Amino acid sequence: MQNQRIRIRLKAFDHRLIDQSTAEIVETAKRTGAQVRGPIPLPTRKERFTVLISPHVNKDARDQYEIRTHKRLVDIVEPTDKTVDALMRLDLAAGVDVQISLG
């Protein structure tokens, strides 16, 4: 796996879960002898929703909700075969979306 790079993008609604998952990935990669760059925090996406709480009139009565999507990026620069095997066996939290790309 020489001259390879593994790029891992993580997304989650809870920032504590995503930080815990990135720490597990970085620790696993370093333990198997790979060079790691990151975790790099990417911009947080904020989706806002406004809902009328009145059934008929009173347009001024509204509730506002927000969903924040936190993102992190981890680059594993020189992965070994042990690194790939350890990352495949790694069990992360259920609320974290993981995208892996080889480059």
UniProtKB/Swiss-Prot annotation:
<dbReference type="InterPro" id="IPR027486">
    <property type="entry name" value="Ribosomal_uS10_dom"/>
</dbReference>
<dbReference type="GO" id="GO:0005840">
    <property type="term" value="C:ribosome"/>
</dbReference>
<dbReference type="Pfam" id="PF00338">
    <property type="entry name" value="Ribosomal_S10"/>
</dbReference>
<comment type="function">
    <text>Involved in the binding of tRNA to the ribosomes.</text>
</comment>
<keyword id="KW-0687">Ribonucleoprotein</keyword>
<dbReference type="InterPro" id="IPR036838">
    <property type="entry name" value="Ribosomal_uS10_dom_sf"/>
</dbReference>
<dbReference type="GO" id="GO:0003735">
    <property type="term" value="F:structural constituent of ribosome"/>
</dbReference>
<keyword id="KW-0689">Ribosomal protein</keyword>
<dbReference type="GO" id="GO:0006412">
    <property type="term" value="P:translation"/>
</dbReference>
<dbReference type="InterPro" id="IPR018268">
    <property type="entry name" value="Ribosomal_uS10_CS"/>
</dbReference>
<protein>
    <recommendedName>
        <fullName>Small ribosomal subunit protein uS10</fullName>
    </recommendedName>
</protein>
<dbReference type="GO" id="GO:0000049">
    <property type="term" value="F:tRNA binding"/>
</dbReference>
<dbReference type="GO" id="GO:1990904">
    <property type="term" value="C:ribonucleoprotein complex"/>
</dbReference>
<comment type="subunit">
    <text>Part of the 30S ribosomal subunit.</text>
</comment>
<comment type="similarity">
    <text>Belongs to the universal ribosomal protein uS10 family.</text>
</comment>
<dbReference type="InterPro" id="IPR001848">
    <property type="entry name" value="Ribosomal_uS10"/>
</dbReference>
